[in-house]
Structure formats: structure tokens, C-alpha cells
């Protein structure tokens, strides 16, 4: 059997990005044949990725990119299973490069992004290799791109909340808007952009509360409408009190600064994803079963 040297293991690791021990095992199985060991790893990592794909990815990070000219930008959410992996440098680098790729290549959807050239392969082959290397499922959940003749601003809070803003005005206004949106999480610019289902749900709750008051129908109707309007003011950006000066709304602040906002994108990691929970006893049992 050929000697499995440290240099050989290092070379295979550099080619595949697989963990050191996996490289050594593959070389041993391949009797020192580098090409064969690479193929063995590809199969193993593929199997590992397939097993991981069934697991829930509710953690992750937001990636943001704005071109040097400030006219095109992108925000992307990539999910993983644990917060620990979300801090992995390879994972972070993957996300940042994806955000730039979205901005420059303008893919139609996640499937189109997955097929784009990336490194020595595609986005999808790189993702699969990263799953094998890290040992957790990784999924590209969503992205949005903005191309504008105006200006772009962005803000990321702890890697978990990402905002991209299209606006006209001073750079400081864009920064303030992005930070305000991250803090207050508005649903839309104005009432016209609020989802009809959200309004209907709020109206239903208001009707139930108002009906319990025992007041005349015309008063109940006014109470309901008042509650709905209050809700809309709370969730629409232009109506919200500015976080840096709550005596004026965002709309008033923009008017004062001679600025305007066209669009914003707000991503919150894991928003709407149901996290899998397990009690300690179940986790121990599952781990024991995995070793059996």
C-alpha cells in the first residue's frame, strides 16, 4: 500500500475542501491514488449532503452587496441549521459572494442562481461541497436585487436583519432609513402596499373586540375603522415616527431633507420558518441511535 503522507492529504484537502480526516480515510481507501480518493470523497460528500437536505434550516445570515457606483445592489438570505455554523468563515464568504453574484448577474430565481458559474463549478456544486465540509444543511432561501438611477443604502444588524433601500437624497438619509427599517420592521411604504390578508386579520380582531363593548353599531364601526387605521400607521414606513426624532414621521423627515424613498427590502433570518424542537431526552436517544 502506498504511504499516505501529510503532503498528499493536504493536496486532497485543497482540491476538495473536505475535512482532514475524511481526506485521509479516502486516500487510505484509494490506496494513495489521488484521483480515486477525490471521487470517493465526491460520493461521500454527496451522500452527506443528501442526508443533510432533509433537516430544517432556520438559522443563517443575510448577505448584502452594493456596487461601487451605488446603482445596483442585492440582499440574500442563506440558511443553515445552527447559529454555530452561521459564524463559520467559509459560510460567511459563500453568502457575501452570492450577494455580489445576484447584483451583477441578475438571476431570475434561486434555481437560476444555483446554475450560475461559481469558482470551479456552479453555485449548487459549491453549496453541496460546503454542506459536506461543514456537516449541516445549507439552503439559499431568497434574494432581491435593485437596479436604480437613484441611490442605494443598506444596513445589516448582527447578520440576522438586512435592509436594502432605494432612495433619493443625501447619503445620511439613506443610512437613517435603513437603520430605522431594521429597528421597526415596517410591512410596506404606505397603506397601499400592506397585504390585504394582514388588514383583514387586523379588522377581524378589531371587530371581535368592538362587538364585546356593547355599544351601538355605528360606534362599533368607527371603533373598528379606528383600530385598522392605527394598525396601518404602525406598519407603514412613511407613517411611522422616525426613531431618531419621534416628533416627526418618516414622511415628514424626508420632506424636511428634500429626500424620497422608492422602495425597501427587509429580510429577517428564519422569518416564517418553523424551527424543529426536541427535548433533551429525545436528543440523547437520537444521538445514541445514530451511533448504533
From Swiss-Prot:
SUPFAM superfamilies: Elongation factor Ts (EF-Ts), dimerisation domain (SSF54713), UBA-like (SSF46934). GO terms for molecular function: translation elongation factor activity. CDD domains: UBA_EF-Ts. InterPro entries: EF-Ts_dimer_sf (IPR036402), Transl_elong_EFTs/EF1B (IPR001816), Transl_elong_EFTs/EF1B_dimer (IPR014039), Transl_elong_Ts_CS (IPR018101), UBA-like_sf (IPR009060). Its main location: cytoplasm. It comes from the Bacteria. Belongs to the EF-Ts family. PANTHER family: ELONGATION FACTOR TS, ELONGATION FACTOR TS, MITOCHONDRIAL. This is Elongation factor Ts. The gene is tsf.
Amino acid at each position: 500500500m502506498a504511504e499516505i503522507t501529510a503532503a498528499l492529504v493536504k493536496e486532497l484537502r485543497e482540491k476538495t475542501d473536505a475535512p482532514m480526516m475524511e481526506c485521509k480515510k479516502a486516500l487510505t481507501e484509494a490506496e494513495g491514488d489521488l484521483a480515486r480518493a477525490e471521487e470517493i470523497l465526491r460520493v461521500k460528500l454527496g451522500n452527506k449532503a443528501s442526508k443533510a437536505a432533509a433537516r430544517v434550516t432556520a438559522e443563517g445570515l443575510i448577505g448584502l452587496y452594493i456596487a461601487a457606483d451605488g446603482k445596483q445592489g442585492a440582499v440574500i438570505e442563506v440558511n443553515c441549521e445552527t447559529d454555530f455554523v452561521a459564524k463559520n468563515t467559509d459560510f460567511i464568504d459563500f453568502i457575501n459572494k452570492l450577494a455580489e453574484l445576484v447584483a451583477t448577474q441578475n438571476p431570475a430565481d434561486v434555481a437560476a442562481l444555483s446554475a450560475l458559474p461559481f469558482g470551479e463549478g456552479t453555485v449548487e456544486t459549491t453549496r453541496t461541497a460546503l454542506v459536506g465540509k461543514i456537516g449541516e444543511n445549507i439552503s439559499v432561501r431568497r434574494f432581491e436585487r435593485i437596479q436604480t438611477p437613484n441611490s442605494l443604502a443598506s444596513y445589516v444588524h448582527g447578520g440576522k436583519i438586512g435592509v436594502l433601500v432605494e432612495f433619493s437624497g443625501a447619503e445620511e438619509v439613506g443610512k437613517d432609513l435603513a437603520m430605522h427599517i431594521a429597528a421597526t420592521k415596517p410591512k410596506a411604504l404606505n397603506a397601499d402596499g400592506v397585504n390585504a390578508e394582514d388588514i383583514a386579520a387586523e379588522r377581524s380582531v378589531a371587530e371581535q373586540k368592538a362587538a364585546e363593548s356593547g355599544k351601538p353599531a355605528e360606534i362599533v364601526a368607527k371603533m373598528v375603522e379606528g383600530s385598522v387605521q392605527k394598525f396601518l400607521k404602525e406598519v407603514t414606513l412613511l407613517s411611522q415616527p422616525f426613531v431618531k426624532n419621534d416628533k416627526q414621521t418618516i414622511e415628514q423627515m424626508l420632506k424636511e431633507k428634500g429626500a424620497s424613498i422608492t422602495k425597501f427590502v427587509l429580510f429577517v433570518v428564519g422569518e416564517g420558518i418553523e424551527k424543529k424542537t426536541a427535548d433533551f431526552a429525545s436528543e440523547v436517544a437520537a444521538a445514541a441511535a445514530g451511533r448504533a
